[in-house]
Swiss-Prot record:
Keywords: Repeat, TPR repeat. This is Tetratricopeptide repeat protein 24. Residues 220-258 are annotated as: Disordered. TPR repeats lie at residues 35-68, 72-105, 112-145, 152-185. The keyword Repeat applies. Residues 233-246 have a biased composition (Polar residues). It comes from the Eukaryota. The keyword Repeat applies. PROSITE patterns: TPR, TPR_REGION. InterPro entries: TPR-like_helical_dom_sf (IPR011990), TPR_2 (IPR013105), TPR_24 (IPR024812), TPR_rpt (IPR019734). It holds the Pfam family TPR_2.
Length: 334
């Protein structure tokens, strides 16, 4: 119904609300079926950008899901939705739990996406060192599973985190890697990365000039001292301009990065073996929020698609992960 042009927004909303009322009223229904139902309901609200209603539906689904993989999917959906809403404290808690649960059942691909969502939450909270660590975990998971999109998104996040930490050589390295990996993405993605790479290069060169100016050999006489001081001042000004340009670029990352958030939000398929043949697609990476902002490292969904996956991130990392994808059947925002 959501993908059909035969129905308007009011028709879809009416159908969702009627379905919800029926489920709320009929508690005789098998609890194992209600979990997937409320999760799907949340996915419907998410696609309509009714994010508070999506959170409410996902919270109803969580205690009704019996399998760790299903619980992990709902936790990940909650984390992604809270990221879109700007509730980063709540988002990072849900993503941590989801990453641990995905790891406990060998869902390495899904775990990588949870780490990316967690890293974004941490970066928005200003904890760039922790964000760096989570992006590294996301990159490793993406490499383990051959997830090229996950790899360049993690590299882009690592570049931004490195810049915030003052590690401009690392920022250059990861932006270059991200650009090399995203050749099949839309031109807007490549243009964004080129702009970030250029800003990182300007900042790096300016910082190098400052470092060199500090070690210039001193010469006698006031004239030499004056020239050295002027040179140092010019270099410092150049570095500050480059740094300011980079921060402006990363401020718009709240636009560009928040756009990617709707780039991590993939919709997954279904819950339960009886629904495994359901077709799946996902929205193009990026997209505006109701306020006009864009979300980086989320992918706004167009249809539904699956994932499955229990404890915390550190415990999960110590496990041996399966390289084959295990599907839970629950619709998830990736």
């Amino acid at each position: 119904m959501l993908s059909s042009r035969q129905y308007g927004l009011s028709d879809v909303l009416r159908a969702l609300e009627e379905s919800r009322k029926l489920a709320d009223a009929d508690r005789s229904t098998d609890q194992g079926l209600l979990g997937p139902f409320y999760n799907d309901l949340g996915m419907g609200y998410f696609q309509l950008q009714l994010f508070p209603l999506a959170v409410e539906a996902f919270l109803q689904a969580l205690p009704l899901c019996r399998q760790p993989s299903e619980q992990a999917t709902v936790l990940q959906n909650l984390g992604m939705t809270h990221n879109v809403l700007g509730n980063y404290w709540e988002a990072q808690e849900f993503h941590q739990k989801a990453a641990s649960l995905h790891g406990s059942v060998g869902q390495r691909w899904e775990q990588g996406r949870s780490f990316s969502g967690l890293a974004f939450s941490l970066s928005q909270l200003g904890d760039h060192r922790a964000a760096w660590d989570s992006y590294l975990h996301a990159l490793q998971a993406a490499q383990d599973t051959g997830d090229v999109k996950g790899q360049w998104q993690a590299c882009e996040g690592l570049g931004a985190a490195a810049a915030r930490l003052g590690q401009h050589d690392q920022a250059l390295k990861y932006y270059k890697e991200a650009l090399a990996l995203c050749q099949h993405e839309p031109s807007s993605v490549r243009e964004r990365l080129v702009a970030k790479l250029a800003d990182a290069m300007r900042t790096f060169v300016a910082q190098e000039k400052i470092a060199q100016a500090r070690f210039l050999p001193s010469a006698p006489g006031k004239l030499q001292t004056s020239r050295k001081a002027k040179t140092s001042a010019r270099v410092q000004s150049s570095a500050e301009d480059a740094q300011e340009s980079q921060w402006e670029g990363e401020a718009s990352e709240g636009g560009h990065e928040k756009k990617e958030m709707e780039g991590l939000v993939n919709t997954a398929t279904v819950l339960g073996p009886q629904r495994q043949n359901r077709a799946t697609t996902h929205l193009p990476s990026g997209g505006p929020s109701p306020s006009g902002e864009e979300y980086p490292f989320i992918i706004a969904p167009k249809k539904l698609r699956v994932s499955r996956s229990s404890t915390w991130a550190k415990e999960a990392l110590g496990r041996n992960f399966q390289r084959t994808r295990i599907q839970s059947g629950l619709c998830s925002i990736m």
